[in-house]
Design a protein with these regions (language model features):
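Composition-driven, intrinsically disordered low-complexity tracts enriched in small residues
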Residues: 2-365
Length: 365
Protein backbone atom coordinates (compact mmCIF):
# COMPACT_ATOMS: atom_id res chain seq x y z
CA UNK A 1 0.00 0.00 0.00
CA UNK A 2 1.35 3.41 -0.96
CA UNK A 3 0.11 6.97 -0.83
CA UNK A 4 1.27 10.02 -2.72
CA UNK A 5 -1.02 12.85 -1.68
CA UNK A 6 1.08 15.92 -0.79
CA UNK A 7 -0.88 18.80 0.70
CA UNK A 8 -0.30 21.60 3.18
CA UNK A 9 1.95 24.64 3.31
CA UNK A 10 5.73 24.41 2.99
CA UNK A 11 6.05 25.49 6.62
CA UNK A 12 3.77 22.64 7.71
CA UNK A 13 5.68 20.12 5.63
CA UNK A 14 9.03 21.13 7.06
CA UNK A 15 7.52 21.07 10.57
CA UNK A 16 6.38 17.52 10.09
CA UNK A 17 9.69 16.48 8.56
CA UNK A 18 11.81 17.90 11.35
CA UNK A 19 9.91 16.36 14.25
CA UNK A 20 9.78 12.70 13.37
CA UNK A 21 12.71 10.55 14.47
CA UNK A 22 13.95 9.87 11.00
CA UNK A 23 10.45 9.07 9.87
CA UNK A 24 10.06 11.84 7.33
CA UNK A 25 13.17 13.72 6.36
CA UNK A 26 13.92 16.01 3.44
CA UNK A 27 17.54 16.05 2.43
CA UNK A 28 19.30 18.38 0.05
CA UNK A 29 21.67 15.66 -1.13
CA UNK A 30 21.82 16.00 -4.89
CA UNK A 31 22.63 12.81 -6.74
CA UNK A 32 21.87 12.90 -10.49
CA UNK A 33 22.14 9.12 -10.71
CA UNK A 34 19.34 8.84 -8.15
CA UNK A 35 16.76 10.54 -10.37
CA UNK A 36 14.06 8.07 -11.32
CA UNK A 37 10.53 7.65 -12.57
CA UNK A 38 9.37 6.61 -9.11
CA UNK A 39 10.71 7.14 -5.60
CA UNK A 40 9.52 4.80 -2.84
CA UNK A 41 9.93 6.05 0.73
CA UNK A 42 10.06 3.80 3.80
CA UNK A 43 9.54 6.05 6.81
CA UNK A 44 11.06 5.68 10.26
CA UNK A 45 9.71 4.39 13.54
CA UNK A 46 6.23 5.60 14.50
CA UNK A 47 5.59 7.52 11.27
CA UNK A 48 2.37 5.51 10.79
CA UNK A 49 1.24 6.37 14.32
CA UNK A 50 1.80 10.09 13.85
CA UNK A 51 -0.09 9.88 10.59
CA UNK A 52 -3.25 9.53 12.70
CA UNK A 53 -2.48 12.40 15.09
CA UNK A 54 -4.54 15.50 14.20
CA UNK A 55 -2.59 18.50 12.92
CA UNK A 56 0.62 16.49 12.54
CA UNK A 57 1.24 16.80 8.78
CA UNK A 58 3.28 13.68 8.08
CA UNK A 59 1.76 13.01 4.68
CA UNK A 60 2.28 16.63 3.69
CA UNK A 61 5.95 16.38 4.65
CA UNK A 62 6.47 13.53 2.21
CA UNK A 63 6.35 15.97 -0.69
CA UNK A 64 9.50 17.64 0.60
CA UNK A 65 11.18 14.29 1.12
CA UNK A 66 10.91 13.39 -2.51
CA UNK A 67 11.85 16.58 -4.25
CA UNK A 68 15.58 16.33 -3.50
CA UNK A 69 15.93 12.95 -5.21
CA UNK A 70 14.00 13.47 -8.41
CA UNK A 71 13.36 15.86 -11.21
CA UNK A 72 10.16 17.89 -11.19
CA UNK A 73 8.41 15.24 -13.28
CA UNK A 74 9.27 12.25 -11.11
CA UNK A 75 6.72 10.73 -8.73
CA UNK A 76 7.02 9.79 -5.08
CA UNK A 77 5.19 7.22 -3.01
CA UNK A 78 5.37 6.47 0.70
CA UNK A 79 5.23 2.74 1.38
CA UNK A 80 2.85 1.79 4.16
CA UNK A 81 4.09 -0.48 6.96
CA UNK A 82 3.65 -0.57 10.79
CA UNK A 83 6.91 1.26 11.62
CA UNK A 84 6.38 0.13 15.20
CA UNK A 85 8.63 -0.74 18.13
CA UNK A 86 6.63 -2.98 20.46
CA UNK A 87 5.20 -2.15 22.97
CA UNK A 88 4.95 1.25 21.30
CA UNK A 89 2.81 2.86 20.07
CA UNK A 90 0.51 0.19 21.62
CA UNK A 91 0.63 -3.31 23.09
CA UNK A 92 -1.06 -4.54 19.92
CA UNK A 93 1.75 -3.17 17.74
CA UNK A 94 4.05 -5.58 15.90
CA UNK A 95 7.60 -5.96 17.13
CA UNK A 96 10.30 -4.04 15.29
CA UNK A 97 11.40 -7.25 13.59
CA UNK A 98 7.90 -8.04 12.38
CA UNK A 99 7.39 -4.42 11.32
CA UNK A 100 10.60 -4.54 9.27
CA UNK A 101 9.53 -7.82 7.63
CA UNK A 102 6.17 -6.34 6.62
CA UNK A 103 7.85 -3.21 5.31
CA UNK A 104 10.34 -5.25 3.32
CA UNK A 105 7.57 -7.20 1.59
CA UNK A 106 5.64 -4.01 0.86
CA UNK A 107 8.67 -2.28 -0.67
CA UNK A 108 9.44 -5.32 -2.83
CA UNK A 109 5.83 -5.42 -4.00
CA UNK A 110 5.87 -1.69 -4.77
CA UNK A 111 9.11 -2.00 -6.76
CA UNK A 112 7.75 -4.91 -8.78
CA UNK A 113 4.59 -2.95 -9.59
CA UNK A 114 6.50 0.16 -10.64
CA UNK A 115 7.38 1.02 -14.21
CA UNK A 116 10.72 2.47 -15.24
CA UNK A 117 13.52 3.34 -12.85
CA UNK A 118 12.99 3.33 -9.09
CA UNK A 119 14.79 4.86 -6.11
CA UNK A 120 14.05 3.34 -2.70
CA UNK A 121 14.69 5.69 0.22
CA UNK A 122 14.87 4.32 3.75
CA UNK A 123 14.83 6.48 6.85
CA UNK A 124 15.83 5.16 10.29
CA UNK A 125 13.83 1.90 10.75
CA UNK A 126 12.89 2.34 7.12
CA UNK A 127 16.56 2.03 6.16
CA UNK A 128 16.56 -1.51 7.56
CA UNK A 129 13.41 -2.13 5.51
CA UNK A 130 15.28 -0.87 2.43
CA UNK A 131 18.24 -3.14 3.21
CA UNK A 132 15.89 -6.12 3.43
CA UNK A 133 14.12 -5.22 0.20
CA UNK A 134 17.47 -4.87 -1.54
CA UNK A 135 18.46 -8.41 -0.52
CA UNK A 136 15.09 -9.88 -1.45
CA UNK A 137 15.05 -8.28 -4.90
CA UNK A 138 18.60 -9.41 -5.54
CA UNK A 139 17.78 -13.00 -4.59
CA UNK A 140 14.79 -13.10 -6.94
CA UNK A 141 15.87 -14.53 -10.32
CA UNK A 142 13.10 -12.46 -11.88
CA UNK A 143 13.98 -9.34 -9.90
CA UNK A 144 14.72 -5.96 -11.50
CA UNK A 145 18.05 -5.35 -13.18
CA UNK A 146 20.81 -3.46 -11.40
CA UNK A 147 20.29 -0.31 -13.42
CA UNK A 148 16.57 -0.06 -12.71
CA UNK A 149 16.65 0.23 -8.91
CA UNK A 150 18.83 2.31 -6.58
CA UNK A 151 18.76 2.65 -2.79
CA UNK A 152 19.45 5.56 -0.41
CA UNK A 153 19.47 5.02 3.36
CA UNK A 154 19.61 7.57 6.17
CA UNK A 155 20.62 6.85 9.77
CA UNK A 156 20.82 3.10 9.14
CA UNK A 157 21.28 1.18 12.43
CA UNK A 158 21.99 -2.06 10.57
CA UNK A 159 25.09 -0.46 9.04
CA UNK A 160 25.91 1.34 12.30
CA UNK A 161 25.16 0.48 15.91
CA UNK A 162 24.38 -3.17 15.09
CA UNK A 163 28.13 -3.66 14.62
CA UNK A 164 28.56 -3.54 18.40
CA UNK A 165 27.15 -7.06 18.77
CA UNK A 166 28.26 -10.34 17.16
CA UNK A 167 26.97 -11.03 13.67
CA UNK A 168 23.60 -12.78 13.85
CA UNK A 169 22.86 -11.84 17.47
CA UNK A 170 19.14 -12.09 18.23
CA UNK A 171 17.85 -9.07 20.17
CA UNK A 172 14.63 -10.10 21.98
CA UNK A 173 13.39 -6.56 22.61
CA UNK A 174 13.46 -5.90 18.87
CA UNK A 175 12.63 -9.45 17.73
CA UNK A 176 15.39 -8.92 15.19
CA UNK A 177 18.82 -10.32 14.34
CA UNK A 178 21.74 -7.94 13.96
CA UNK A 179 23.17 -8.99 10.61
CA UNK A 180 25.21 -7.06 8.11
CA UNK A 181 23.33 -5.95 4.98
CA UNK A 182 23.47 -8.58 2.26
CA UNK A 183 25.84 -7.95 -0.63
CA UNK A 184 23.72 -7.22 -3.73
CA UNK A 185 24.08 -6.00 -7.29
CA UNK A 186 22.30 -2.73 -6.51
CA UNK A 187 23.94 0.63 -5.81
CA UNK A 188 23.25 2.25 -2.45
CA UNK A 189 24.06 5.66 -0.98
CA UNK A 190 24.49 5.63 2.80
CA UNK A 191 23.98 8.92 4.65
CA UNK A 192 25.54 9.00 8.12
CA UNK A 193 25.04 11.83 10.60
CA UNK A 194 28.09 12.57 12.75
CA UNK A 195 27.28 11.69 16.39
CA UNK A 196 24.00 10.00 15.38
CA UNK A 197 23.95 7.06 17.83
CA UNK A 198 22.32 4.76 15.27
CA UNK A 199 24.46 5.36 12.19
CA UNK A 200 27.60 6.80 13.85
CA UNK A 201 27.75 4.85 17.09
CA UNK A 202 30.55 5.22 19.70
CA UNK A 203 32.53 1.97 19.59
CA UNK A 204 34.21 2.79 22.91
CA UNK A 205 31.02 2.91 25.00
CA UNK A 206 32.99 3.08 28.26
CA UNK A 207 33.62 6.75 27.41
CA UNK A 208 30.68 8.25 29.32
CA UNK A 209 31.12 11.73 27.83
CA UNK A 210 30.82 10.21 24.37
CA UNK A 211 27.71 8.31 25.47
CA UNK A 212 26.04 11.48 26.74
CA UNK A 213 26.84 13.25 23.49
CA UNK A 214 25.43 10.34 21.47
CA UNK A 215 22.23 10.31 23.53
CA UNK A 216 21.60 13.94 22.65
CA UNK A 217 22.63 13.12 19.10
CA UNK A 218 19.43 11.11 18.81
CA UNK A 219 17.48 14.34 19.12
CA UNK A 220 19.81 16.79 17.44
CA UNK A 221 21.37 14.67 14.67
CA UNK A 222 19.34 11.55 13.87
CA UNK A 223 16.08 13.45 13.55
CA UNK A 224 17.64 16.23 11.49
CA UNK A 225 19.56 14.28 8.84
CA UNK A 226 16.93 15.26 6.33
CA UNK A 227 17.59 18.98 6.49
CA UNK A 228 21.28 18.74 5.63
CA UNK A 229 22.67 21.07 2.98
CA UNK A 230 24.44 19.58 -0.05
CA UNK A 231 27.77 21.13 0.89
CA UNK A 232 27.59 19.50 4.34
CA UNK A 233 27.77 15.98 2.92
CA UNK A 234 31.27 14.56 2.57
CA UNK A 235 31.93 11.37 0.63
CA UNK A 236 33.97 9.18 2.95
CA UNK A 237 34.05 5.88 1.09
CA UNK A 238 33.07 4.15 -2.15
CA UNK A 239 33.20 0.37 -2.43
CA UNK A 240 32.14 -1.96 -5.24
CA UNK A 241 31.33 -5.53 -4.24
CA UNK A 242 31.75 -8.80 -6.13
CA UNK A 243 28.26 -8.49 -7.64
CA UNK A 244 28.97 -5.03 -9.06
CA UNK A 245 26.92 -3.06 -6.54
CA UNK A 246 28.55 0.14 -5.31
CA UNK A 247 28.05 1.46 -1.78
CA UNK A 248 28.89 5.15 -1.37
CA UNK A 249 28.94 6.53 2.16
CA UNK A 250 28.46 10.21 2.95
CA UNK A 251 29.02 11.90 6.31
CA UNK A 252 27.00 14.88 7.46
CA UNK A 253 29.61 16.45 9.76
CA UNK A 254 28.37 18.16 12.92
CA UNK A 255 29.34 21.79 13.32
CA UNK A 256 28.47 21.70 17.03
CA UNK A 257 28.43 18.94 19.63
CA UNK A 258 24.93 17.65 20.48
CA UNK A 259 26.10 17.62 24.11
CA UNK A 260 26.18 21.41 24.26
CA UNK A 261 23.24 22.14 21.98
CA UNK A 262 20.82 22.56 24.93
CA UNK A 263 23.00 25.45 26.13
CA UNK A 264 22.60 27.15 22.77
CA UNK A 265 18.87 26.48 22.86
CA UNK A 266 18.43 28.28 26.19
CA UNK A 267 20.35 31.32 25.00
CA UNK A 268 23.90 30.84 26.24
CA UNK A 269 26.11 32.93 23.90
CA UNK A 270 27.58 30.89 21.07
CA UNK A 271 31.05 32.22 21.83
CA UNK A 272 30.97 30.61 25.28
CA UNK A 273 29.52 27.33 24.04
CA UNK A 274 32.10 27.23 21.25
CA UNK A 275 34.82 27.31 23.92
CA UNK A 276 33.14 24.40 25.70
CA UNK A 277 33.00 22.50 22.41
CA UNK A 278 36.72 23.02 21.89
CA UNK A 279 37.43 21.40 25.25
CA UNK A 280 34.86 18.61 24.98
CA UNK A 281 35.21 17.56 21.34
CA UNK A 282 38.56 15.72 21.77
CA UNK A 283 37.06 13.85 24.73
CA UNK A 284 33.94 12.95 22.74
CA UNK A 285 35.93 11.96 19.66
CA UNK A 286 38.08 9.63 21.77
CA UNK A 287 35.04 7.34 21.91
CA UNK A 288 35.17 6.68 18.16
CA UNK A 289 37.86 4.53 16.57
CA UNK A 290 37.18 6.22 13.22
CA UNK A 291 38.67 9.37 14.74
CA UNK A 292 41.94 7.64 15.63
CA UNK A 293 45.18 8.74 14.06
CA UNK A 294 47.52 6.27 12.38
CA UNK A 295 49.28 4.10 14.92
CA UNK A 296 46.61 4.48 17.61
CA UNK A 297 46.13 1.08 19.22
CA UNK A 298 43.46 1.87 21.81
CA UNK A 299 40.85 -0.92 21.96
CA UNK A 300 37.29 -0.65 20.70
CA UNK A 301 34.34 -2.98 20.11
CA UNK A 302 33.62 -4.55 16.73
CA UNK A 303 31.10 -7.35 16.22
CA UNK A 304 31.11 -8.26 19.89
CA UNK A 305 34.89 -8.44 20.13
CA UNK A 306 37.27 -6.10 21.88
CA UNK A 307 39.84 -5.31 19.20
CA UNK A 308 42.63 -2.87 18.56
CA UNK A 309 44.31 -1.69 15.38
CA UNK A 310 47.86 -2.88 14.79
CA UNK A 311 50.60 -0.68 13.42
CA UNK A 312 49.65 -1.91 9.95
CA UNK A 313 46.02 -0.93 10.46
CA UNK A 314 44.73 -4.51 10.76
CA UNK A 315 42.28 -5.38 13.56
CA UNK A 316 43.80 -7.50 16.31
CA UNK A 317 41.48 -9.30 18.74
CA UNK A 318 42.01 -8.36 22.39
CA UNK A 319 39.13 -10.42 23.80
CA UNK A 320 36.73 -12.79 22.08
CA UNK A 321 33.37 -13.63 23.70
CA UNK A 322 31.22 -16.64 22.90
CA UNK A 323 28.55 -16.32 20.19
CA UNK A 324 26.30 -14.17 22.36
CA UNK A 325 28.19 -14.09 25.65
CA UNK A 326 27.30 -10.61 27.00
CA UNK A 327 28.80 -11.48 30.39
CA UNK A 328 32.12 -12.56 28.89
CA UNK A 329 32.22 -9.50 26.69
CA UNK A 330 31.55 -7.15 29.59
CA UNK A 331 34.19 -8.91 31.70
CA UNK A 332 36.73 -8.47 28.94
CA UNK A 333 35.90 -4.81 28.63
CA UNK A 334 36.12 -4.31 32.39
CA UNK A 335 39.50 -6.01 32.48
CA UNK A 336 40.87 -3.92 29.63
CA UNK A 337 39.51 -0.67 31.06
CA UNK A 338 40.85 -1.54 34.52
CA UNK A 339 44.30 -2.15 33.03
CA UNK A 340 44.26 1.20 31.26
CA UNK A 341 42.93 3.00 34.35
CA UNK A 342 45.63 1.41 36.51
CA UNK A 343 48.35 2.72 34.20
CA UNK A 344 46.82 6.21 34.19
CA UNK A 345 46.50 6.19 38.01
CA UNK A 346 50.08 5.00 38.42
CA UNK A 347 51.42 7.76 36.22
CA UNK A 348 49.28 10.40 37.91
CA UNK A 349 50.44 9.29 41.38
CA UNK A 350 54.06 9.47 40.35
CA UNK A 351 53.61 12.92 38.83
CA UNK A 352 51.72 14.36 41.81
CA UNK A 353 54.09 12.80 44.34
CA UNK A 354 57.02 14.39 42.59
CA UNK A 355 59.10 11.23 42.79
CA UNK A 356 59.67 11.15 39.09
CA UNK A 357 58.38 12.51 35.83
CA UNK A 358 55.40 10.69 34.28
CA UNK A 359 56.64 8.59 31.43
CA UNK A 360 55.10 8.33 28.00
CA UNK A 361 53.29 5.13 27.05
CA UNK A 362 54.85 2.51 24.89
CA UNK A 363 51.99 2.68 22.40
CA UNK A 364 50.38 -0.53 23.60
CA UNK A 365 47.59 1.17 25.53
Amino acid sequence: MVWSNAVGTRRQRLFGASLLAGATAATTLTCPAAQADTMLIAGGTFYSFFDHVPYFPVKAAAGDIGRWFRSADDGWQVVDYPASFWPLPSLASPTAGRSIAIGTDNVVDAVNRSDGTVVVVGLSQGSVVADGAMAKLDADPNGPDRGRVRFIVFGDPQRGVAKLVPEGTYIPLLDWRATAPTETKYDVDVIVGEYDPLSDYPDRPWNLVTDANAALGMAYVHTQLGVSKPDDLQEVSRETNSKGGTTTTYLDAAENLPLTRPLRDVGVPDALVDKADEVLRPVVDAGYSRKDKAGDTRPYIYRGQLVRATSSGVKSVVATPQRVGPQKLSSSIRAEVAKIADKVTHRTTRAVGGTSKATAGDGSD
